[in-house]
């Protein structure tokens, strides 16, 4: 598991709304059985993303919005296959997390 990996959401109850989960946890905690993720939803689902809180990324040729306000810890067993890595968007991801916590 790598920081900023995007995983399929295998949960049949939520994968239609949140098809992907973004791993935001540092690689240095890879020994844990859990990880911290932020769900991604299709841009059209959210309608109007908050400017600093909900950055938009391309995953599998579609636009997805990071729902930073829904950050959570989950078991690694609850993640599907890795589909991409968003390390190239590191600044936007960290800025959204920082805004959630400090509003800066």
Residue ranges, per PLM feature:
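Residues that cap or initiate secondary-structure elements
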Residues: 13, 43-44, 63, 72
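C-terminal terminal-subdomain/extension
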Residues: 58-104
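Residue-level detector of secondary-structure boundary/capping sites
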Residues: 12, 48, 84-88
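A generic "functional-site adjacency" signal
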Residues: 1, 15, 87-91
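Residue-level marker of positions within ordered structural domains that often coincide
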Residues: 12, 26, 99-102
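Compact nucleic-acid interaction/catalytic patches
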Residues: 3-6, 14-56
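Short amphipathic alpha-helical segments, especially helix-boundary/capping motifs
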Residues: 1-2, 30, 70-74
């Amino acid at each position: 598991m790598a920081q900023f990996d995007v995983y399929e959401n295998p949960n049949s109850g939520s994968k239609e709304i949140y098809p992907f989960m973004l791993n935001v946890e540092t690689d240095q905690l890879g020994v844990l059985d859990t990880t911290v993720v932020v769900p991604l939803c299709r841009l059209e689902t959210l309608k109007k993303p908050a400017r600093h809180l909900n950055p938009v990324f391309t995953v599998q040729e579609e636009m997805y919005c990071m729902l930073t306000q829904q950050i959570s810890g989950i078991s690694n067993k609850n993640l599907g296959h890795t589909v991409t890595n968003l390390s190239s968007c590191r600044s936007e991801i960290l800025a959204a997390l920082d805004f959630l916590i400090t509003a800066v």
